[in-house]
Protein backbone atom coordinates (compact mmCIF):
# COMPACT_ATOMS: atom_id res chain seq x y z
CA UNK A 1 0.00 0.00 0.00
CA UNK A 2 1.86 3.11 -1.23
CA UNK A 3 -0.08 5.56 0.94
CA UNK A 4 1.57 4.28 4.12
CA UNK A 5 4.69 6.15 2.96
CA UNK A 6 4.62 9.55 4.66
CA UNK A 7 6.40 11.13 1.70
CA UNK A 8 4.22 9.59 -1.03
CA UNK A 9 3.13 13.00 -2.31
CA UNK A 10 6.73 14.19 -2.77
CA UNK A 11 7.66 10.85 -4.36
CA UNK A 12 4.85 11.27 -6.90
CA UNK A 13 5.83 14.89 -7.49
CA UNK A 14 9.42 13.82 -8.14
CA UNK A 15 8.35 11.11 -10.57
CA UNK A 16 6.03 13.51 -12.41
CA UNK A 17 8.94 15.97 -12.81
CA UNK A 18 11.16 13.43 -14.59
CA UNK A 19 11.64 14.30 -18.25
CA UNK A 20 9.81 11.83 -20.48
CA UNK A 21 7.27 10.76 -17.86
CA UNK A 22 3.90 11.36 -19.52
CA UNK A 23 1.61 10.05 -16.82
CA UNK A 24 1.75 9.12 -13.14
CA UNK A 25 -0.76 6.53 -11.95
CA UNK A 26 -1.21 5.13 -8.46
CA UNK A 27 -2.82 1.93 -7.22
CA UNK A 28 -4.14 1.91 -3.66
CA UNK A 29 -6.84 0.35 -1.51
CA UNK A 30 -7.99 3.96 -0.86
CA UNK A 31 -8.29 3.56 2.92
CA UNK A 32 -5.67 6.30 3.45
CA UNK A 33 -6.53 8.32 0.34
CA UNK A 34 -9.02 10.91 1.61
CA UNK A 35 -6.54 13.24 3.36
CA UNK A 36 -4.02 13.22 0.48
CA UNK A 37 -6.14 12.95 -2.68
CA UNK A 38 -5.96 16.65 -3.60
CA UNK A 39 -2.23 16.76 -2.83
CA UNK A 40 -1.58 13.72 -5.02
CA UNK A 41 -3.50 15.32 -7.88
CA UNK A 42 -1.54 18.56 -7.45
CA UNK A 43 1.70 16.53 -7.37
CA UNK A 44 0.96 15.21 -10.86
CA UNK A 45 -0.87 11.93 -10.30
CA UNK A 46 -3.42 11.79 -13.11
CA UNK A 47 -5.07 8.38 -12.71
CA UNK A 48 -5.96 6.12 -9.81
CA UNK A 49 -6.64 2.41 -9.53
CA UNK A 50 -8.54 1.65 -6.33
CA UNK A 51 -8.64 -1.94 -5.12
CA UNK A 52 -12.01 -3.01 -3.71
CA UNK A 53 -12.55 -6.76 -3.66
CA UNK A 54 -15.72 -6.63 -1.55
CA UNK A 55 -18.43 -4.26 -0.36
CA UNK A 56 -19.04 -6.29 2.78
CA UNK A 57 -17.45 -4.51 5.76
CA UNK A 58 -16.40 -7.71 7.55
CA UNK A 59 -14.88 -9.29 4.44
CA UNK A 60 -13.21 -5.98 3.64
CA UNK A 61 -11.53 -5.96 7.05
CA UNK A 62 -10.29 -9.50 6.39
CA UNK A 63 -8.96 -8.95 2.87
CA UNK A 64 -7.28 -5.61 3.71
CA UNK A 65 -6.00 -6.76 7.10
CA UNK A 66 -8.21 -4.56 9.27
CA UNK A 67 -9.07 -1.80 6.76
CA UNK A 68 -12.45 -0.12 7.08
CA UNK A 69 -14.82 -0.07 4.11
CA UNK A 70 -16.02 3.40 5.12
CA UNK A 71 -12.45 4.67 4.62
CA UNK A 72 -12.50 3.24 1.09
CA UNK A 73 -15.67 5.21 0.31
CA UNK A 74 -14.18 8.37 1.83
CA UNK A 75 -11.09 7.87 -0.34
CA UNK A 76 -13.20 7.34 -3.45
CA UNK A 77 -15.25 10.47 -2.76
CA UNK A 78 -12.06 12.49 -2.14
CA UNK A 79 -10.56 11.18 -5.38
CA UNK A 80 -13.66 12.19 -7.32
CA UNK A 81 -13.56 15.66 -5.73
CA UNK A 82 -9.86 15.99 -6.65
CA UNK A 83 -10.79 15.53 -10.32
CA UNK A 84 -8.34 12.82 -11.40
CA UNK A 85 -8.40 12.14 -15.15
CA UNK A 86 -9.53 8.54 -14.61
CA UNK A 87 -10.48 6.40 -11.64
CA UNK A 88 -10.71 2.64 -12.02
CA UNK A 89 -11.85 0.21 -9.36
CA UNK A 90 -10.28 -3.26 -9.35
CA UNK A 91 -11.77 -6.40 -7.84
CA UNK A 92 -10.16 -9.83 -7.91
CA UNK A 93 -13.02 -12.32 -7.98
CA UNK A 94 -12.65 -15.25 -5.59
CA UNK A 95 -15.16 -18.10 -5.58
CA UNK A 96 -16.69 -18.59 -2.16
CA UNK A 97 -15.52 -15.17 -1.02
CA UNK A 98 -16.86 -12.36 -3.21
CA UNK A 99 -18.43 -14.05 -6.23
CA UNK A 100 -21.84 -13.21 -4.76
CA UNK A 101 -21.00 -9.50 -5.08
CA UNK A 102 -20.52 -9.23 -8.85
CA UNK A 103 -23.74 -7.26 -9.32
CA UNK A 104 -23.21 -4.92 -6.36
CA UNK A 105 -19.61 -4.22 -7.41
CA UNK A 106 -20.70 -3.61 -11.03
CA UNK A 107 -23.42 -1.26 -9.83
CA UNK A 108 -20.74 1.09 -8.51
CA UNK A 109 -20.53 2.26 -12.15
CA UNK A 110 -24.13 3.46 -11.86
CA UNK A 111 -23.41 5.53 -8.76
CA UNK A 112 -19.94 6.87 -9.57
CA UNK A 113 -18.15 7.94 -12.80
CA UNK A 114 -15.61 5.12 -12.50
CA UNK A 115 -14.75 1.94 -14.34
CA UNK A 116 -15.12 -1.35 -12.44
CA UNK A 117 -12.58 -3.95 -13.50
CA UNK A 118 -12.99 -7.59 -12.60
CA UNK A 119 -9.76 -9.55 -12.54
CA UNK A 120 -9.61 -13.32 -12.65
CA UNK A 121 -7.74 -14.90 -9.77
CA UNK A 122 -4.33 -16.14 -10.88
CA UNK A 123 -4.02 -19.89 -10.45
CA UNK A 124 -1.74 -20.73 -7.54
CA UNK A 125 -0.60 -24.26 -6.94
CA UNK A 126 -1.11 -25.50 -3.39
CA UNK A 127 -2.41 -22.16 -2.10
CA UNK A 128 -3.81 -22.78 1.40
CA UNK A 129 -6.78 -20.41 0.99
CA UNK A 130 -7.76 -20.70 -2.67
CA UNK A 131 -8.35 -24.01 -4.37
CA UNK A 132 -9.66 -24.59 -7.91
CA UNK A 133 -13.17 -23.52 -6.85
CA UNK A 134 -11.85 -20.01 -6.18
CA UNK A 135 -11.41 -19.32 -9.91
CA UNK A 136 -14.25 -17.22 -11.37
CA UNK A 137 -14.18 -16.80 -15.16
CA UNK A 138 -15.21 -13.65 -16.96
CA UNK A 139 -18.03 -15.69 -18.54
CA UNK A 140 -19.49 -16.07 -15.05
CA UNK A 141 -19.36 -12.30 -14.61
CA UNK A 142 -21.30 -11.84 -17.84
CA UNK A 143 -23.86 -14.42 -16.70
CA UNK A 144 -24.39 -12.33 -13.55
CA UNK A 145 -24.72 -9.16 -15.65
CA UNK A 146 -26.95 -10.13 -18.60
CA UNK A 147 -27.82 -6.47 -19.29
CA UNK A 148 -24.15 -5.53 -19.87
CA UNK A 149 -23.53 -4.26 -23.40
CA UNK A 150 -20.19 -4.66 -25.21
CA UNK A 151 -18.22 -1.42 -25.64
CA UNK A 152 -15.46 -0.52 -28.06
CA UNK A 153 -11.96 -1.32 -26.82
CA UNK A 154 -10.04 1.64 -25.41
CA UNK A 155 -6.62 0.32 -26.34
CA UNK A 156 -6.21 -1.52 -23.04
CA UNK A 157 -6.24 -5.25 -22.38
CA UNK A 158 -9.69 -5.44 -20.79
CA UNK A 159 -12.86 -6.46 -22.60
CA UNK A 160 -15.26 -3.58 -21.96
CA UNK A 161 -18.97 -3.63 -21.15
CA UNK A 162 -21.49 -1.11 -19.82
CA UNK A 163 -24.62 -1.44 -17.77
CA UNK A 164 -27.70 0.61 -18.70
CA UNK A 165 -27.55 4.11 -17.15
CA UNK A 166 -23.97 3.54 -15.97
CA UNK A 167 -21.44 6.35 -15.69
CA UNK A 168 -18.47 4.07 -16.32
CA UNK A 169 -17.50 0.80 -17.97
CA UNK A 170 -16.98 -2.69 -16.67
CA UNK A 171 -13.66 -4.21 -17.68
CA UNK A 172 -12.98 -7.93 -17.68
CA UNK A 173 -9.43 -9.30 -17.47
CA UNK A 174 -8.61 -12.92 -18.13
Regions found by a protein language model. Name each.
Residues 1-2:
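Glycine-rich, proline-tolerant flexible connector loops at the mouths of alpha/beta enzymes
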Residues 5-109, 115:
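Radical SAM/AdoMet-radical enzyme domain recognition
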Residues 93-97, 120-125:
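Glycine-rich beta-alpha junction loops
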Residues 111, 121-124, 128-174:
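Auxiliary Fe-S-binding modules of radical SAM enzymes
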